[in-house]
Amino acid sequence: MVNKITVVGAGNVGATTAQRLAEKQLAKVVVMVDVVEGVPQGKALDQWESAPIEGFDTRVIGTNGYEETADSDIVIITAGIARKPGMSRDDLLNTNAGIVKQVSEHVKRSSPTAIIIMVSNPLDVMAYVAKKVTGFPRERVLGMAGVLDTARYRSFIAEALDVSVEDIQAMVLGGHGDTMVPLISYTTVSGIPVTQLMDQKTLDAIVTRTRNGGAEIVKFLKTGSAYYAPSAASVQMAEAIVHDRKRVLPCAAWLEGEYGMSGLFLGVPCKLGRKGLEQIIEVELTSKERTDLGKSAEAVREPMSVLKL
């Protein structure tokens, strides 16, 4: 258990993340901060009132300022707006970049030794904004993408094969978007290569569904997006850090030559421990996987070029 974890943003993702953090007792205090008056306070109070039933002692606090977030060990950033009708991707990008920039400035001042887990979209670019604004080393700025995308991929494979999700080992690398790269060559069912259990056509359909995982949920909900799985993914990362578990999880990390790339955040296998990012693990890729990862990197770099910071 650490002393304090802050969740920035009290929308569906942020509030569900705060609840999961409290229920797992990963910190003595969980602070939920949001610009909308009353929302973080009300949701935090509601969560705290569930403590006697759920059996946790983590104090949940809601606030509109950053004073109570001071000296947080981990800051999970979920703040941002959803794309509105008539809004271009560049408009959305720069609006959310402005929000993340402001949040990052607060984090730099109030919690200068914190580890940041970025959840706001477009994920890989927002992680870059946070790193650039805070000046934090790459060990302390991570993006939550691969854990979520991998969970979706694993759940679809388990469903298709009618086996437990726990027996699916897999990894999805690359950017958090439709160019993500599920690694079929590293996908197994209790050690059995998935290619021995499933035909290529079914696998290809699952890869496509994984890439469109977020959009599929938005289509169903119509006025919202996913939050149960995204919050679970960010909390799994936080848990690995808090308990120094040395978990190997696919996360968006700042590359400095790994996989032949530098100067961007991209989903790669990361060892997470108490210091945050402890190691980027380079795995052998097929030529197609390497090509696809390169295309994914280009898709991440493109919006970085239109950023107005």
Show where each model-derived region lies.
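Rossmann-like NAD(P)-binding element
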Residues: I53-I115
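Glycine-rich Rossmann-fold phosphate-binding loop(s) that bind the pyrophosphate
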Residues: A10-G11
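Extreme N-terminal starter segment of soluble prokaryotic enzymes
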Residues: V2-I5
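Conserved N-terminal Rossmann-fold NAD(P) cofactor-binding segment
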Residues: V33-S72, R301-L309
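C-terminal substrate-binding/catalytic lobe of Rossmann-fold NAD(P)-dependent dehydrogenases
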Residues: T134-E139, D149-L309
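N-terminal Rossmann-fold NAD(P) dinucleotide-binding loop
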Residues: G14-A15
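Rossmann-like NAD(P)(H) cofactor-binding subdomain of soluble oxidoreductases
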Residues: S88-R154
